[in-house]
Structures are given as C-alpha cells and as structure tokens.
C-alpha cells in the first residue's frame, strides 16, 4: 500500500474546514466522509486500475491548536505497491501538496 503523509497548518478560523474541502475538491477528489474534524475524499474512477484509486484523509488536530496555528494531518494512499517512486499515488500527493500551497490560508510540509 502506498502512503504519503503531509502536514498542513493554517490560522484557525471559521472557514478552515471549508477551505480543506475546497483544496481536496480542487484536486478532482470526491468528498465521501465529512465530520467536524475529519474528511475523507477519494479519486473518481476514470480508467485507472482499482488498486491505483487514491483516498485522501484529513484530520484536523484541534488538541494542539493555538490561536495562531492549527495542524491538519493529511494522508494520501491507495492499494498500489509503490514499486517506483513516480507512481500514481505520489503524483496525486504532489497535486494535493500544490493545491495546499496555492491556497494562501495553508502552509505545508511533507510528512
């Protein structure tokens, strides 16, 4: 199973959760589970093998939140064995990383 973690941080405000949803949807991911502190999205089937379909989980870590920063742990994963470093899951991870960077609200570090 390929797993690629990201750590995103943002200034906590009312739009944080919606901003996380917007970032994931901008990567053509479909939101399949959404709670106050957890979001799961998946790649829409589009001609790629089932094992390569990517799931993205985002956990908003409110326990360590400060007035200035809140952490969101993001994991991009699929069932594909990562035989090559440039695989489908890693490309989706790169896309998610770039989407977070493009949003002025977020700061991202690779996990």
Language-model regions, residue ranges each:
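Ser/Thr-rich, low-complexity intrinsically disordered terminal regions
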Residues: 1-111
């Amino acid at each position: 199973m390929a797993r690629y973690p990201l750590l995103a941080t943002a200034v906590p405000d009312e739009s944080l959760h919606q901003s996380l949803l917007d970032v994931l949807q901008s990567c053509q991911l479909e939101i399949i589970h959404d709670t106050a502190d957890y979001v799961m999205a998946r790649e829409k089937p589009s001609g790629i093998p089932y094992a390569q379909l990517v799931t993205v989980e985002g956990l908003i870590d409110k326990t360590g939140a400060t007035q200035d920063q809140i952490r969101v742990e993001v994991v991009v994963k699929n069932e594909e064995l990562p035989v090559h470093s440039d695989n489908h899951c890693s490309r989706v991870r790169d896309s998610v990383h770039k989407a977070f960077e493009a949003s002025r609200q977020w700061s991202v570090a690779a996990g």
